[in-house]
Amino acid sequence: MLAKRIVPCLDVREGKVVKGVQFRNHEIVGDIVPLAARYAEEGADELVFYDITASAHDRVIDKSWVSRVAEQIDIPFCVAGGIKTIEQAREKLAFGADKISINSPALSDPSLISRLQDEFGRQCIVIGIDSFYDAVSDSYKVKQFTGDEAATKDTQWYTQDWVEEVQKRGCGEIVLNVMNQDGVRGGYDIKQLSIVRAICDVPLIASGGAGTMEHFKAVFELAKVDAALAASVFHKGIIDIGELKQYLHANNIAIRL
């Protein structure tokens, strides 16, 4: 059995790590490189960096901090933010990122997924999906440009349909960002993740809702995800990564110690 992964997420805006609640009201958490180094030291399996306003503001991740992170940590990391071309992806990988993630650019140009896969291989192509539960229609819908409240918009896609579409086009991994749960620390959306897991044949990363160690245990056991991403519980020191891994190991979750 492959080991499950614990993945701290660092949302980046204007060169700082920030965190919001349900994709709104972001506050500064700290500097990028020291936080990345801390999480690597604590035992994170991988890191994800989202430049949250890049796509909405039509720019690309700042390459300077990508190279500084690569110099400081020895675990894999993924970067996202405004990557719309092969050349932009190549640059980020050349500066040390192990994977690139695309979200809003893929919604604008789905063929980008297959072009990136053809060029770099699916193993380093991650698709981020910002999924919102619409209680009125009792359905899961994909949102775009969520890093900026003023720019956020609905798309034509229902979450399940988009999950299937990005797999057909060659993605190697999916991060499901459950917007309703983001930052509230009430637990992962097991129901939605289980629905997606049933149609997802590539590694699936749960994102949104982690508040306790039990939440990580539940998402691995019940939703069968491959990795759990979290931000505020790590940024605020609510959960220590090393202690979390010991807890999961003690509860028979396959995890690297």
UniProtKB/Swiss-Prot annotation:
Keyword Ribonucleoprotein assigned: no
Protein's cellular compartments: Cytoplasm
InterPro entries noted in UniProt: Aldolase_TIM, His_biosynth, HisF, IGPS_HisA/HisF, RibuloseP-bd_barrel
Catalysed reactions listed for this entry: 5-[(5-phospho-1-deoxy-D-ribulos-1-ylimino)methylamino]-1-(5-phospho-beta-D-ribosyl)imidazole-4-carboxamide + L-glutamine = D-erythro-1-(imidazol-4-yl)glycerol 3-phosphate + 5-amino-1-(5-phospho-beta-D-ribosyl)imidazole-4-carboxamide + L-glutamate + H(+)
Top-level taxonomic group: Bacteria
GO CC list: cytoplasm
Gene Ontology biological process terms, A to Z: L-histidine biosynthetic process
One Gene Ontology term of the molecular function aspect: imidazoleglycerol-phosphate synthase activity
Active site: 11, 130
Keywords for this protein: Amino-acid biosynthesis, Cytoplasm, Histidine biosynthesis, Lyase
Similarity comment: family membership: Belongs to the HisA/HisF family.
Subunit structure: Heterodimer of HisH and HisF.
Function field: IGPS catalyzes the conversion of PRFAR and glutamine to IGP, AICAR and glutamate. The HisF subunit catalyzes the cyclization activity that produces IGP and AICAR from PRFAR using the ammonia provided by the HisH subunit.
Protein name from the UniProt record: Imidazole glycerol phosphate synthase subunit HisF
Taxonomic lineage: Bacteria, Pseudomonadati, Pseudomonadota, Gammaproteobacteria, Alteromonadales
